[in-house]
């Protein structure tokens, strides 16, 4: 019997994700990113970008394509993606997603390592130190460090412009959050509850629940996270609804076998409530990028729809094309029926 392959898409792991306003697609950041990963023992060895035709190739033999993925975009492309893998223990993935036109409010950087690495020894502390080094590198507005299964089960789509999504095992809050919450309250949090509160060099803060990150979904840790939310103030949290398990397959949904009202319930949940949000740093840099994009000619609606795999239909209607079958669907009417985006609480 052959050896079972590693499930790169669904492996159990611990994830670090940063939401970054400040553009960080420079050669210096790309080089330092690899240096930090290597320093902590997580050097990747495989690469996939549009410049490798989305194929997985050996990183060291394709460094030009690595930097090109960070620095260049295809004509009319609205984003840049760099995907990395580490195929030896601890195995994991590293992804960079950058809005090339500056219209999306955040860029993303994430690192995921397999769960076994965190079960014993210094792995957890080493990963946390790497996270702090990456925080210093990209100056994010927000970051979370969590067991991946727990993070998926606890929240839906995270929208920082509607408030914090919740408290996770590790929480990086940029200086804008420190200013909004008040450092006195954050210091008191570390005294009153069994959590670690660390002031970061840029006056941001790191809140860690303690214990092992793999236990973050236990009742005790969930209660501790809830206590932190209560202490800081519920008005700062958006309380995004966790995703509901789908009682149907997407194949049946695309085939029109699922009633529109059921699709709306599970695929178009109500918006989360609006919480208090800070004034995010570096917004002027994103605005500058957007202006540069527009001066360069930007992209038409038709080109954007083509870029993401959609097509124009009629006077403004949009259809989605199933790449596997070639069948097209009118959205939202044909699949979801008429309906709004949901009501705020």
Positions of predicted regions on the chain:
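C-terminal interaction module
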Residues: 1-45, 153-345
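Internal, hydrophobic cores of structured domains that mediate oligomerization or house catalytic pockets
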Residues: 38-161
